[in-house]
């Protein structure tokens, strides 16, 4: 990729050294790492491996200088970057984490990329040169700097996080599983972006990744960490038959030749490792993993003759349809893989099939033998308890599912809710925990597990309920090879016990190993999909199942042609992958928000707009009469009309204010202080001349105070306001920008709240009373908010936020003559209204004259 901007200086590659280094978190008994020794030369590209729990992420956080100090844990030995303690050398390292959402700090692309440079005090002119340069390197140079980060795909967000790090010129690039949350396209995007970075900057790189093959062409050295002795894992084989520290160090060929078996046992995806083709069922009998390889008798026994779940002319989405006229049938004894790019709508389709989101049009139906007594065949119409054991959903975010205080209770919850005894439910839970290597965590709180362990727990808790239709959103995310293999086995067992398993996944090895039928969910403008069976926008009722008699066949059954005649159609899976066409993500972006409905207000500095709202309110608080409120309100309407906002637009934009003002009028008119003539008296209701006057005064005062404040706030950009508060009002940047980042997190928490409600419905807990349900969800949301805040704080700290150096600014906030006019208006209008009321004798008069 050719750069188009002048280089502002290439960062020098950093040298890294560890001398008998170790770290123990304050809340843990055992050391996360111990006796770590290595030297990394400038420009080296290192792959950091180790079993789950070996402390890879802890080491990466330490190198980024965000691990904490003496209050956060106990440190041994030394860890340095260019000879300086890693905590003091934070400006020399840049950390990119797993989750793109947890690293996006500001709303606009350019602001987010510039955030780290501002934290380091880089001069303003150089900031934008660095931003353009870094966005160019990662392939985002064609995206407008003012574009909202909410409209980026997962791969684009991760590349933006990488660009924000590159703009800091760190010298040491730290990548902690940066592709774990991405689809194959996103993985390629990030990989290629990193390759561009290394070719142009020659920075030192350390990357942590389970899937070694992703980075194999970019690395020249492999370092393997072992677990400290006290952290042994009793649940299975791992690479911890060592005292910790570095157990292997060399070129990729040397390490994989010498340590391949140990790494594989520890869970790494070693190149050349064979994917299993068989598994042992609950009786210990060897069975094929791929459905196409099953014995015909087994096939006949486990496969349902009729579909268990049908999408009939389905339109799905959240408010606006993402896909329309979708027709699919899912059979028992089969595995289906909903595949496609990030953001296409796979999870939304899965939630709709699970009966958790209502169809926008059409129907989702289940087979007759699954319908609860007296109910329709639409799972969305069922109660939460009726869903349990029939249709189950494993959510993309495991923490959305947690509803108990221990790992064991989490798995036992489903069986208990289905009426099984405590003893039987606990037996099922213990068996499931043993299968997934979670036995030692049985008494632990689910929130204390690692990301991969949480994913296994979320799958185990739903498998324990043995639903007839099991829908799983990214079931193998974050798994090493050992736990991935066990997850593969559990899915195969569920399938061969007659369940229809529907997976949202990007995991090609998983799909291949299970012989799953692919259903592509892809944007309507994507011409690269190899499929002839378009199941959206058509009238066909297409059911897809794997053929038992062919290694690569998929039967399309119960099809109807355009004339409605039934046909039995058989097509090859390789050529006839069903395709659900959805609205392209680029077409779902929100229209650009105007800075204000008023041309005059749009020209004002955000701080001026904020201050005007306050200044216009304060004098009116000292008045409660019809005249002052009427004068102020009349002048405000005239000024808004001159500024380009007609009265009808004002009313439309501020309708909640009018409702509030009307409510105040009614309550005061009916129950206000009585004086003057009485018009109606009935019980507590007493409408008098005085109460009506006060009601009118309150109605007008509410409008006079609130209408201009709302118009001034409409379209106000939070980032521009934050810049103004720091630069013009001189509020502490740490307070202002921390609050700004928190505002963005609030949007994510709204999504979390909705997901928690859907999850509790899926787990049989959605029939509780509204108050009890809200309390339970509020606790879960509190935990999620703390965890999100922690991740966000880490991302901000990794970008230099809160450091000792003075902060610079990328966007200058200035006041102009028009702002002076705004301040004059804000003072003159309410003061003039008060003067008129005082001179006419109406100021705060309780009765009409």
Describe each region flagged by the PLM.
Residues 173-177, 470-474:
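Catalytic Walker B motif of ABC-type/P-loop ATPase nucleotide-binding domains
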Residues 49-51, 339-341:
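The feature captures the beta-strand-to-loop junction immediately N-terminal to the Walker
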Residues 148-152, 156, 445-449, 453:
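Conserved ABC ATPase signature
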Residues 585-628, 632-637, 751-849:
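Transmembrane alpha-helix interface motif
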Residues 228-272, 521-584:
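Conserved beta-strand-loop-alpha-helix hinge in the C-terminal portion
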Residues 64, 354:
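Helix-to-loop junction immediately C-terminal to a conserved catalytic motif
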Residues 126-143, 423-441:
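Conserved ABC ATPase "signature" region
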Residues 165-166, 462-463:
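ABC ATPase C-loop
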């Amino acid at each position: 990729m050719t750069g188009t901007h002048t280089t502002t200086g290439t960062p020098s590659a950093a040298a890294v050294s560890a001398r008998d280094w170790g770290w123990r978190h304050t809340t843990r008994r055992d050391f996360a790492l111990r006796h770590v020794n290595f030297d990394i030369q400038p420009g080296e590209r290192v792959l950091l491996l180790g079993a789950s729990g070996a402390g890879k992420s802890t080491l990466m956080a330490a190198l980024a200088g965000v691990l904490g100090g003496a209050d956060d844990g106990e440190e041994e030995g030394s860890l340095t970057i260019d000879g300086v303690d890693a905590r003091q050398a934070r400006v020399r390292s840049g950390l990119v984490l797993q989750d793109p959402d947890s690293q996006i700090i500001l709303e606009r692309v350019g602001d987010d990329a510039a955030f780290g440079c501002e934290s380091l005090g880089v001069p303003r002119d150089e900031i934008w040169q660095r931003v353009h340069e870094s966005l160019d390197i990662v392939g985002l140079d064609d995206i407008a700097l003012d574009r909202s980060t909410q409209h980026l795909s997962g791969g684009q967000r991760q590349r933006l996080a990488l660009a924000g790090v590159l703009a800091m010129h760190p010298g040491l690039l730290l990548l902690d599983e940066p592709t774990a949350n991405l689809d194959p396209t996103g993985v390629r995007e990030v990989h290629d972006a990193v390759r561009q970075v290394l070719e142009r900057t020659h920075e030192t790189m350390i990357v942590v990744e389970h899937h070694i093959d992703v980075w194999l062409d970019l690395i020249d050295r492999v370092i393997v960490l072992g677990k400290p002795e006290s952290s042994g894992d009793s649940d299975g084989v791992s690479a911890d038959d060592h005292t910790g520290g570095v157990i292997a160090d060399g070129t990729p060929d040397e390490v994989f030749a010498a340590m391949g078996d140990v790494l594989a046992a520890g869970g790494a995806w070693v190149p050349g490792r064979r994917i299993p083709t068989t598994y042992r069922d609950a009786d210990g009998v060897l069975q094929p993993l791929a459905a196409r390889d099953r014995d015909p008798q087994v096939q006949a026994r486990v496969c349902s003759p009729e579909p268990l779940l049908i999408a009939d002319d389905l339109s799905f989405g959240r408010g606006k349809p993402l896909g329309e006229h979708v027709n699919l049938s899912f059979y028992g004894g089969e595995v289906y893989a909903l595949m496609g790019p990030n953001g296409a709508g796979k999870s939304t389709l899965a939630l709709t099939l699970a009966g958790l989101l209502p169809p926008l049009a059409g129907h989702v139906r289940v087979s007759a033998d699954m319908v609860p007594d007296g109910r329709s065949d639409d799972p969305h119409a069922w109660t939460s308890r009726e869903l349990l054991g029939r249709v189950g959903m494993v959510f993309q975010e495991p923490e959305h599912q947690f509803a108990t205080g221990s790992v064991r209770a989490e798995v036992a919850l489903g069986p208990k809710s289905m009426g099984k005894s405590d003893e039987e439910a606990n037996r099922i839970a213990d068996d499931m925990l043993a299968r997934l290597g979670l036995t030692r965590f049985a008494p632990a709180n689910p929130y204390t597990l690692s990301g991969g362990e949480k994913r296994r727990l979320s799958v185990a808790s739903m498998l324990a309920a043995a639903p007839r239709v099991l829908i799983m959103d990214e079931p193998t995310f974050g798994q090493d090879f050992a736990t991935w293999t066990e997850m593969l086995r559990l899915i195969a067992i569920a399938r061969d016990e007659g369940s229809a398993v529907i997976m949202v996944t990007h995991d090609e090895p998983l799909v291949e190993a299970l012989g799953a039928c692919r259903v592509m969910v892809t944007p309507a403008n994507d011409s690269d999909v190899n499929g002839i069976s378009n199941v959206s926008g058509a009238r066909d009722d297409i059911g897809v199942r794997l053929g038992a008699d062919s290694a690569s066949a998929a039967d399309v059954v119960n099809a109807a042609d355009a004339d409605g005649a039934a046909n039995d159609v058989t097509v090859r899976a390789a050529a006839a992958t069903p395709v659900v066409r959805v609205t392209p993500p680029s077409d779902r972006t929100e229209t650009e928000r105007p800075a204000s409905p008023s041309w005059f207000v749009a020209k004002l500095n955000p701080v001026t707009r904020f201050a005007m709202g306050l200044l216009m309110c304060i004098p009116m608080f000292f008045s409660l009469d019809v005249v002052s409120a009427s004068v102020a309100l009349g002048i405000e309407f005239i000024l808004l009309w001159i500024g380009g906002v007609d009265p009808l637009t004002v009313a439309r934009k501020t309708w909640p204010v009018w409702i509030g003002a009307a409510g105040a009028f009614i309550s005061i008119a009916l129950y206000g202080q009585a004086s003057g003539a009485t018009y109606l008296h009935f019980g507590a209701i007493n409408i008098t001349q005085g109460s009506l006057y006060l009601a009118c005064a309150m109605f007008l005062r509410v409008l006079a105070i609130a209408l201009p404040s709302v118009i001034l706030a409409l379209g106000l950009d939070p980032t521009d306001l934050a810049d103004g508060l720091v630069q013009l009002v001189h509020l502490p940047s740490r307070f202002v920008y921390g609050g700004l980042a928190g505002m963005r997190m609030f949007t994510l928490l709204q999504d979390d709240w909705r997901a928690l409600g859907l999850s509790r419905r899926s787990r049989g807990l959605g029939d509780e009373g509204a108050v009890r349900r809200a309390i339970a969800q509020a606790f879960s949301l509190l935990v999620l908010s703390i965890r999100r805040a922690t991740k966000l704080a880490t991302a901000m700290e990794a970008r230099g936020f809160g450091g000792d150096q003075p902060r610079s600014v990328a966007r200058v906030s200035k006041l102009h003559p028009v702002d002076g006019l705004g301040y004059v208006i804000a003072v003159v209008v309410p003061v003039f209204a008060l003067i008129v009321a005082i001179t006419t004798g109406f100021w705060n008069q309780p009765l009409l004259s």
